[in-house]
């Protein structure tokens, strides 16, 4: 982990020391960051909401010069997913090897399938599923659930097997 003076992690958030955090990154309450996740905020800040899960080898990179990347609450970024979106809403599932390209925007309750892409500058409406080799879109009829049980399990088990990053409390002003 580098540049910890610009990293703020809430006290109830679990971050494994094998994660790499560069630049100004604020991670709010209840998130879980697995080993080998990369947060790269060298071009602009990354603000992460509550109760998100970032699985192994996920890469969250803000490529917009000086503009913040905002990630809402209760999202799951699965193994090897990549996100350079300017905005990700809440309750989204970003599948294994999925890619949110530079400057795209994902609203709430979206599901991005394995190996699917949301292309640069594309804006997804709420409850859109992206699936298949041609990145087809459709509207889903049910919203995504918050990953409450998965978060509880990970908060309990990860500290038993990994060293955790020391945190600084996020204040109300942030």
Swiss-Prot record:
Its main location: cytoplasm. GO terms for biological process: mitotic spindle organization. GO terms for molecular function: dynein complex binding. SUPFAM superfamilies: Trimeric LpxA-like enzymes. It comes from the Eukaryota. Keywords: Cytoplasm, Cytoskeleton. GO terms for cellular component: cytoplasm; dynactin complex. It is found in: Cytoplasm, Cytoskeleton. Subunit of dynactin, a multiprotein complex part of a tripartite complex with dynein and a adapter, such as BICDL1, BICD2 or HOOK3. The dynactin complex is built around ACTR1A/ACTB filament and consists of an actin-related filament composed of a shoulder domain, a pointed end and a barbed end. Part of the dynactin complex that activates the molecular motor dynein for ultra-processive transport along microtubules. Belongs to the dynactin subunits 5/6 family. Dynactin subunit 6 subfamily. This is Dynactin subunit 6.
């Amino acid at each position: 982990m580098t540049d910890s003076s610009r990293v703020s992690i809430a006290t109830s958030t679990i971050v494994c020391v094998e994660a790499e955090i560069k630049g100004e990154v604020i991670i709010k309450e209840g998130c879980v960051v697995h080993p080998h996740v990369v947060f790269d905020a060298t071009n602009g800040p990354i603000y992460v909401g509550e109760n998100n899960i970032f699985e192994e080898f996920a890469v969250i990179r803000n490529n917009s010069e000086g503009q913040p990347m905002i990630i809402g609450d209760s999202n799951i970024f699965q193994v090897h997913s990549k996100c350079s979106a300017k905005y990700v809403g809440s309750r989204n599932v970003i599948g294994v090897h999925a890619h949110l390209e530079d400057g795209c925007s994902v609203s709430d309750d979206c599901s991005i399938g394995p190996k699917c892409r949301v292309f640069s500058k594309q804006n997804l409406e709420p409850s859109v599923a992206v699936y298949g080799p041609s990145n087809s879109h459709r509207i889903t009829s049910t919203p995504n659930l918050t990953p409450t049980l998965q978060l509880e399990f990970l908060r309990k088990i990860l500290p038993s097997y990994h060293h955790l990053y020391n945190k600084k409390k996020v204040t109300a002003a942030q």
